[in-house]
Amino acid sequence: MRAAVLQLSSQGMSSTKFYNYIRIANKKGVKLLLLGEYILNPFFKELQSMSASMIKEQASHQIKILKELSSTYNMTIVAPIIIVKKKQVYKTIAKFAPASTSYYEQQILINYAHWNEEKFFANEIKPLQTPLVFKIDGFKFALISGFELHFDEIFQKLKNKNIDCLLVPSVSTFESYERWKALITTRAFTHNCYILRANRIGEYQDKEFTWNFYGDSILVSPNGELLTHLGNKEELMIVDMNHADVIASRRTWGFKEAINKRVL
């Protein structure tokens, strides 16, 4: 399975840059393209000062374009996008496939004093559901937000899905590089699946400090090995993943087998 991460700062959909990267990915045989958080939309702090009608207009335009690009280039595009329903603003991750579009509504949102998405967005607080799972050419993906990677309960929902790759768009900042790398490699190893993480770049300046989004998009193997990563610049990362390697990792470590023996 050939996939790609497009590591960018916040982009308007009129950006020729975005179209050019899509064409390059298509020529390289990419089947799935992953974007980081707050690339199609302004950063969360900027969204807070925008009207719902403006966000809705922006989202409608973006969705139309992404559907067309997915169909034109026969490529699945996974992209976090802010949408509006009945004047309420929701944080979602969209999967634009050539023949269909699906949305995963983020279930656990960050809720700290300096960064409270849970308070701003209308995403319902309810019992956790299984994240979006789908296949491309027999290769099974699941997708969650970067913040949701912290929670064991999310992985409990995925434990019997036998996914090959977990897609994780993120918006990491504040020099958290080492912590995120440790978290991603550990999750990939203990669940014996690839993790492809797309993090945005750029910065946001508020009254108190500068939020630097440092990139470092990465691919980690089912054995917890860091296979490839980007720096802090605008880049396209093309990766190859193999279902056979996922199966081999599961058989080698036997984590799920050890638990299944003990399930009543």
What are these regions (language model features)?
Residues 246-264:
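A conserved C-terminal secondary-structure "cap"
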Residues 55-78, 150-236:
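CN hydrolase (nitrilase-like) catalytic-core segments centered on the catalytic cysteine
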